[in-house]
Amino acid sequence: MKLDRILPFAKLLLEKAVQPGDITVDGTMGNGFDTVFLAGLTGEKGHVYSFDIQEDAIQITAAKLKAESMHERCTLVHDGHEQMNKYISKEHFGNITGAIFNLGYLPGGDKSIVTQANTTISAIEQLFEMMAPEGIIILVIYHGHPEGATERDALLHYVQDLPQQKAHVLKYDFINQSNNPPFIVAIEKR
């Protein structure tokens, strides 16, 4: 297939937005793959803030970062992404160039612990104010479970109402695939 699948396309967008030395956010740490990816993009002089409410996610991600010698450029936060204002250094406000949220539940974890539209929207609103112009927020929306469908609907309603003078919003999905495949919403600050 020549078209980029969902996760490679998300990474491509982040690679365009993030430069060495930049500040980034992983809003849903999960198994740490995005945190490690962002730490690679930001390099030794950059920084990644990564959030999750599950202790397992913190431990898994910390081990991956240590194995890659990237742990010193990351702040792992054991709290919800809706609390990011409390953790992101004020000196980084206006300097965040990329962020990603993989919404749903932790793969291999407790499927009853899922992201919620209200906390995700709160995080997006906070993050948008901290973003640099042309910074990109990526939402990877997994909606094949009831809570995911509810979150999808609320997020699509929210992003469709963002003023075009403030943001460009892209939806990237495969419309002829069955079983509710994930899709991307990308928000670029103008």
Where do the language-model regions lie?
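Helix-to-beta-strand junctions that scaffold the AdoMet/dcAdoMet cofactor pocket
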Residues: 19, 42-43, 131-133
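Mobile active-site "lid"/loop adjacent to the S-adenosyl-L-methionine
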Residues: 101-122
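Conserved beta-strand signature within the Rossmann-like core of class I S-adenosyl-L-methionine
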Residues: 28, 130-141
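Conserved SAM-binding motif I beta-strand of class I
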Residues: 47-52
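A short glycine-rich, Lys/Arg-flanked "PGG" loop and its adjoining helix->strand segment in the class I
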Residues: 119-133
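S-adenosyl-L-methionine
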Residues: 1-23, 27, 33-36, 40, 58-95
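Class I S-adenosyl-L-methionine
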Residues: 149-190
